Amino acid sequence: MNQILEKPENKKWDTKMPGKLTVSIGEYSDKGRKEINQDFHGSYYPEEPLLSSKGIALAIADGINNSYISQIASETSVAGFLDDYYDTSKSSAVKRSAEQVLIATNSWLHAQSQKTHGHPDNDKDYVCTFSSLILKSTTAHILHIGDTRIYRFRAGKLEQLTTDHCLRVSDEISYLNRGLGIYSILDIDYQTTPMKLDDVFFMTTDGVYEHVSNDFIIDTIEEHIDDLDLAAELLVEQAYQVGSSDSLTAQLVKIDELP
């Protein structure tokens, strides 16, 4: 359910073209101990001229646990973003294009949830977290709502780049206070960061990062840097083995060459 775009079997693009951004991507997702996978993820690696004008996009979303239809929100958010972002004007800035798409998605999700309010089924909210990484030229653009996370692994160090939008009541209980579909007005975190050769960006959901240590993440990336699909699978497997009860998703993207 999570593979929304056709890609080569190993999802690794390694054709070296001088002067062009070149990356390797690895992805893995599993429903874990859930009945269904409430996570959704995807990526799109376009050819020219879109590669230069719009960049490479990855997105990840996690539907809220207390809604049995939130997987629709996560799938709609990721699939819609990867489709609609590339339909925006080629001359429009990344921030404007991406926010335009997310605002429209938020409005649709919020409207669907409002239709169900007042009915006996109060567990039918179209709400999810969402994080996107857009790699264009030598800059990484990050858009983020909720508690999915984006990390950067550089020179042996792992750094969390996003902030969790949740209210933590205890070690076991937290509440999402920002997400797609919660409110009619969307508040998006946006930032940019320069990329360096061999940077690895790690995108994941709480089903993974709450159960896997930073040291394990670092060791897994370093050991399997040439097979990021395997690295992503091992991160998910480790989270499951130590007791994660949530859906689990991991995405990795390595910067192989910069313009």
Segments the model singles out, each with a brief description of its role:
Residues 1-259:
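PP2C/PPM-type serine/threonine phosphatase catalytic domain
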